[in-house]
Amino acid sequence: MRILVTGATGYLGGRLVPMLVEAGHEVVCLARTPEKLDGLPWRGDVEVVQGDVLDAGGLKDAAAGCDAAYYLVHSMASGKEFAEEDRSAAANFRDAADAAGMRRIVYLGGLGPEGEDLSPHLASRHEVGSVLASGETPVTELRAAVIIGSGSLSFEMLRDLPEVLPVMTTPRWVRTRCQPIAVEDVLDLLVQAIGDDGESRVVEVGGPDVLTYQEMMAVYAEEAGLRKRLIIPV
């Protein structure tokens, strides 16, 4: 299968691509800055196309001939425009997939219940899933909780704070409960999802344990052999 991957320069995309290659797929990586992929061990095994999801014409050219695609990009910028950019990018990608006659789009969104107060970024990620699924190409949307793995932003934060500060004054969100999931599990699910058939669907994925960020930092400190950390939410 010929697969278009956006976000190949990112944390998950850079780990997903070699798994797809190993599975026998022909991979096309769309990157705004292709040079970021130079030197990676799998660079010679893939086709790299310079492009941007906000460029509708270039995106359609990159998608032509592809059977399926991964949408692994979203804006983390601040300001009022990020949601509009996310919306436009998703619409461009939906249209490019439809024009190419793709079998499936796999999108990694964020876990959060519908109908509740969501952060602007999480609400935008849900909206992106809806925009992608509004076209002709079926979409598998994986909504993941906090992804834990070496190098992930979540893990680095959970590690760095206990490593540096024996006493921490933290925001109240450290008491927010979530279902952390290992990056290896997310990658396995992404690889499996490209083989989905049938209609669009949303799949919520998380690990077996429900923990607060405070509890996760305490677990890390214990596993790392650090003295018990005092965490004071304010």
Feature roles, as predicted:
Residues 35-100, 110-115:
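NAD(P)H-binding glycine-rich loop region in Rossmannoid oxidoreductase-like domains
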